[in-house]
Amino acid sequence: MYLLHCNSLLDMKIVVKANGGLGNRMRVIASSIALSQRLKTTVEVLWINNVALNCSFFDLFQKLDDIEIVESVYIKSWNKIAHRQRRKKLWNTYQNFDIQLNDEGLKSLSSSQIDLLEHIKNAETVFIDTCEHFYGDLSCLSYLIPADGIAETAKIRLSETGGAYIGVHIRRGDNTMSKANSPTALFIQTLKKEQKRNADIKFYLATDDRGEAKILKKVIGKSIVYYPSELARKRPEGIQQALVDLILLSNAKKIIGSYWSSFTEVASVYGNIPLEVMKSEE
C-alpha cells in the first residue's frame, strides 16, 4: 500500500484528453474528478472541439474545482494542414511523458486487474487519451453542474412536460451497435407495455434521428413528448440541446435506452435512476 503524501504523487502532472461525444466526455471528466480527489492534485483535461463535439465546456457546465479545462478551437474538416499540425503538436507535447495510456492501455490494466494508481505511482508525468470511464465510479458526474442557460432551458421543459414521466433514448447516427441491437420495434413494444400499466404515462423522447421520433409519435401518440433539435454535433447548439435532453432523461422515473450508448448510461447515473436497455435477443 502506498501513501498519498508521497512526493511522486503530489508533484505528478496528469493530463487527460477527453474524446468522443457528450456522454463519453462526461464519463472522462467524472473519472478525472475522481482521480483529482484521490490524489489531491489538479488534473488537466484537454477539451478539443471537433466533429464529435464542437461546444465549449463552459457553455455546457460550470467551472470545476481542481480540474483545469484546456480547450482547442474547432477546425473545419477541409483544413487538413491545421488538423495535421494539431496532431503533431499533441504528439510533440506528450510523447515524452513517463506514462501514456489510451483506450487499449486502460483496458489492458483493467483486464489484468492492475490498479491505475499503482501503475502510475512512480511517474512524474502521465498522459491519458480516452473516451472511457477510467477511474473511480461515475458518481462524480454529480459535480458537473449545468451552465445557467442549459439549466434554465431544462427547467422550462420539465415544467412543460409536467408530472412523472419515463425517459426514452433512441441512439442512431453513427452508432452501429445501437442500431443493430436496439430496434425500433422493441422500443414500441416496451412503451406499449408501459401504457397498459398506466394509460396516462408520458414519454420524454431524446433521439438523434427525426425519423424515429416521427414513427413513435405516430404509433404511441400524444404520450410522446419530443422537442425537435439541432442534430449536428459539429454545431454548439446541437451539443447544448443534447445536454438539455440528457438532463430531462435524468429527471425521469426511469430510462428506456439504447444498447452500447454512453449517453443512455450517463443519463441514468446522472439522475441515479433505473435504466432498462433495449437489446434484441437475435
Where are these regions (language model features)?
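Histidine-anchored nucleotide/phosphate-binding helix
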Residues: 26-37, 187-194
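A structural signal for short, well-ordered beta-strand segments and their strand-loop junctions
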Residues: 15, 42-47, 167-169, 204-206, ...
